[in-house]
């Protein structure tokens, strides 16, 4: 193939091959067994912040809504504290509604299973869209889902819920660009709307779900993802590059419409949450506080060897022996991801990546920007990240 711009759009799922069906079955079975078997023996995955915040607050939401009332107030904290506005309960997230009808631990297990199916399936579908083989796509999907932040942030349910949607967001961004690329330059407004309406719906739903998680860090991560991916799609010449300004404008307008609809879906959580944050100490975060959770550049070795500074002391291993919270360093991506990343870097030629390799340059950009975001105030670029709305109100970049 001489030009990535001529890459045809391929619906790999029509028909769904047998190997794809087996891969999807594995994606469903693994988290189902992982979370149900320990729970059946009295060891549900409820620890740390999930134990003291996320699980009991969701159980409280279910109890309140079962009586026919909205989950507006938690009367059991101090003299009362906002429950919906407090965000941690994820009160209107669709799967939180299961706590109304099911025993809390059962509803919790279903939530966890759904997160990890969503994550792995999203990465699998994204890579199959990129025309990678089923085996490679499955390996990458499992590596993404069961290493790094997806596994390390299991103790923060809503963070994991937001992270699980990342592959789906990238897929929407890329597929929308390719849909518009395939349109003739003479396409009418009706033809453009007909081509992009599916992407509008998907983007709105994904954005709405992110808002409904009630997790500012998930929302900020998706914000940062969009700020990286969308400009990269518009600037990097690849199979989804949009040549004309008309198509670029249509691309941005489509995302804008989807964004407005997504805000409409999540507005019931956004408004009380924003009001609550506005009256808290998170309303104005200093640069020092913002950067207090940044990862020192010299500790980037944790990306490759997560226990290089010790671990939890299990199985005669050494305990953690540096002055930082081990649980907050969750960037380990796994050996498969590292091999794949450096193998791709080895294909770089003097004139850059060539052919279909250009489609994956986007992920190098994400990795580089992600590194600087993780290092935060340890680099001069930390001030740039502190200037991004919403992101500047979060901390713990090492997550």
Which residues make up each language-model segment?
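Start-transfer (signal-anchor) and selected internal transmembrane alpha helices
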Residues: 1-37, 239-243, 249-259, 356-363
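Transmembrane signal-anchor helices characteristic of membrane glycosylation enzymes that use polyprenol
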Residues: 20-53, 258-275, 369-372
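Membrane-embedded helix bundles of polyisoprenyl
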Residues: 28, 118-130, 134-181, 188-236, ...
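Structural signal for the C-terminal ends of transmembrane alpha-helices
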Residues: 34-38, 170-181, 230-241, 342-353, ...
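Active-site lumenal/periplasmic loops and adjacent helix-entry segments of GT-C-fold
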Residues: 37-130, 135-167, 301-327
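Periplasmic/ER-lumenal interhelical loops and adjacent helix-loop junctions
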Residues: 55-72, 258-347
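Membrane-helix boundary/interfacial segments in multi-pass membrane proteins
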Residues: 153-160, 318-329, 369-399
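Membrane-interface helix-loop-helix junctions at transmembrane boundaries of multi-pass membrane enzymes
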Residues: 239-253, 326, 341-380
